[in-house]
């Protein structure tokens, strides 16, 4: 009888403990959804129709990314290579999906509708400094001397394009692959904050267009004319095999949409490089899961940096600064996470302490 009473008491305590968790999870999700509508209130010129469609598009992609990750996890469970997600991971996954959609839609609003008002005041300075530091060469000339043939260029171009789906999958993949809630929270939190501090505020403070847009948006630059011509020649060679240099077509698409209405993906910004910054976070996250996978992603991160220069998207310093900023955010996330968890733990202990 004593045991049954004790078991019943534990069941009641577990149920009561689960309720606050469910309430907190629902509150976080509700706040994320409300944050998704915030631009409509602070930007009167923002049309609600295109903005809501943008949010729905990103939400759909985020849900698809979550489904892919769950499918991969399910396959790993069937083959005995991994365990299924626990209840905590399922809750985190819902939050990660909504955070992905809200963060990226907000970033697109900023990049397309706010950032163009800043202009591109730093390109000439960055280009001149790099030219001097590289003893009279532009960074793209160095990469083309080393990897200027068609095959290396296509490999770099493909690696750069693959970054987009990896970026989308990252928050959901982290939630499922990382069991440690502290590390999981740091990775997802750093992913979200990086779009604000690096991709938005950093891009505003260091506003630049990049080498591929220099002659169109900044002024004449003979070196970047040669770069574009070299890439065009490679694109023509690739066409013989039914291929192309994808970067050239994406660059033209972004140029045509610059200053236009809100669309799914647009906006021009070079420094700091979010491609390299995010690839750095991929490396950090991969090392948290496996040293072997971490080194694979380190190699991929190096490819992204080289490709960003080789294809004309970025100056060399864009990627170096982006990587440094991401490493800084990750370092800061450690004490921040400990502070948050210690506060939550203290609050939980206070609630469970018996009253006198």
Where are the language model's segments positioned?
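Membrane-embedded catalytic cores of phosphoryl/pyrophosphoryl-handling enzymes
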Residues: 250-352, 356
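Aromatic-anchored segments of alpha-helical transmembrane domains
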Residues: 33-41, 103-105, 195-201, 301-310
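N-terminal membrane topogenic signal
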Residues: 13-31
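Loop-to-helix transition at the N-terminal end of transmembrane alpha-helices
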Residues: 48-66
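Interfacial segments of alpha-helical transmembrane regions
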Residues: 92-97, 172-207, 212-226
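Juxtamembrane "helix-exit" motif on the non-cytosolic side of transmembrane helices
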Residues: 38-49, 75-79
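Intramembrane catalytic core of multi-pass membrane enzymes that act on lipidic substrates
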Residues: 90-161
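Membrane-interfacial catalytic/cofactor-binding modules of polytopic membrane enzymes
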Residues: 205-288
